[in-house]
Amino acid sequence: MASNWNAHSWRGHEARHLPVYPHADKLQAVETTLTSFPPLVFAGEARALKADLAEAAAGRAFLLQGGDCAESFAEFHPNNIRDTFRVLLQMAVILTFASKQPVIKVGRMAGQFAKPRSSPMERQGDVELPSYLGDNINGMDFTPESRIPDPDRMLRAYSQAAATLNLLRAFATGGYANLRQVHQWTLDHIGKSPWAAKFGEMADRIGEALDFMQACGVNPATVPQLQGTSFYTSHEALLLQYEEAMTRQDSLTGKWYDTSAHMLWIGDRTRFEGSAHVEFLRGVDNPIGVKCGPSLAPDVLLKLLDTLNPGREAGRITLISRYGYDKVEAGLPALVRAVTREGHPVLWSCDPMHGNVIKADNGYKTRPFERILKEVEGFFAVHRAEGTHAGGIHIEMTGRDVTECTGGAVAISEAGLADRYHTHCDPRLNAAQSLELAFLLAEAINLERAGQKAQAA
């Protein structure tokens, strides 16, 4: 266990982006209730994910992490969970075929409610109210009552996360994730898409590989791995009162785990020195993600790694770069070189979403698909140049046909954003854009593999 740590030691550190609850007794009652609830995930599952991520850090696997910007109570529906899960599976099949490596599937699901905001207050006209911080803290409606932090929302978030996890586990192991079925969904989608000619060849090659396996007797009936899949959950560990209440000691190892998710990450705004969020995460044995952007200096990152992973355990740390399409190739190399020089065993993943938010002329927040793709290409270019492994992708997406990010082959225009703009926070890739990104990622992975083969020769 981490030295001088317990589940509430974070309370002695600086905690930014946490709500101020008006009634301390009500908050304490909710925290006590949560500590008596069953864990949402199990320590052994978190250890299995860590082992998988260690393989990715070593260049033998690839991480696909995706889901909602912020889950909401209003959009909680089994069809929404199913559709996002399905698109992640389709992306994983495409990436597995391209990389010839296992793809680790981690959802931003079953707990991704709270969001740090750039300002604690929101102004509409002459009225100023506390900002919306996520459905597990306060309400989105712009009224004084809705914006008051309510501890009972944590109980509802727990219930929704439990139901979401239950459905995800059923989908992952109950036959829905059948490899042949997943590929058929992709074929159906390609047939309706404007990029059928470009990506149809790869889809056909995947189909031929499945036919070959079938002829050899390798099919879902004979190989369980083709019938189901492993699927993990993750969210930003922002609301520390909830995370503390969900922390349990593993009876087998004696280590502490945050059982609200398999993997947790710390954001750009909460990883400063002396942070309560860093203090909490250094003591739980889950895999941890760290967002890395232009404001993070190499020496600060190295100190953070020494704090979060003093034993240099492989699979413990995933560094998620988020620079912006025009900054990644200038900013990321210094971090990669510093981490490589010091020998920290990290997995490098790319978040091409958060550095590429713009405001359209009609007032909608959006992310141009072309900028998202350009940041991914820059991320791969940096790792090719540095001789390191571009090991993952972290995206905000949905399986629904929303119109929140402009561009892509579906050619969503700024004028078209209003058609189906449903996000509670930041704009997400829709199903078609997510699949297009997977095919383009596959091309980048193939380029990386070609470079590795050339070096080996």
Question: Model regions: which residues?
Answer:
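Short, well-ordered loop/turn elements at secondary-structure boundaries
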Residues: A58, S260, G283-D285, E342-H344, ...
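Active-site-facing alpha/beta catalytic cores
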Residues: A70-E71, E75-G324, R367, E375, ...
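Glycine-rich, charged/polar anion/phosphate-binding loops
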Residues: A48-K50, G274-H277, L304, P333-L335
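A general structural signal for short secondary-structure junctions and capping/turn motifs
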Residues: L53-A56, I94-T96, F280-L281, V382-A385
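Non-transmembrane, aqueous-exposed alpha-helical and coiled segments at domain scale
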Residues: R316-L347, H354-T403
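Basic/polar N-terminal segments that are highly enriched at the extreme N-terminus
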Residues: M1-W5, A450-A457
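N-terminal basic/disordered segments at the start of proteins
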Residues: M1-F62
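Short loop/turn segments at strand-loop or loop-helix junctions that form parts
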Residues: L64-C69, V106-M109, C350-M353, E396-T398
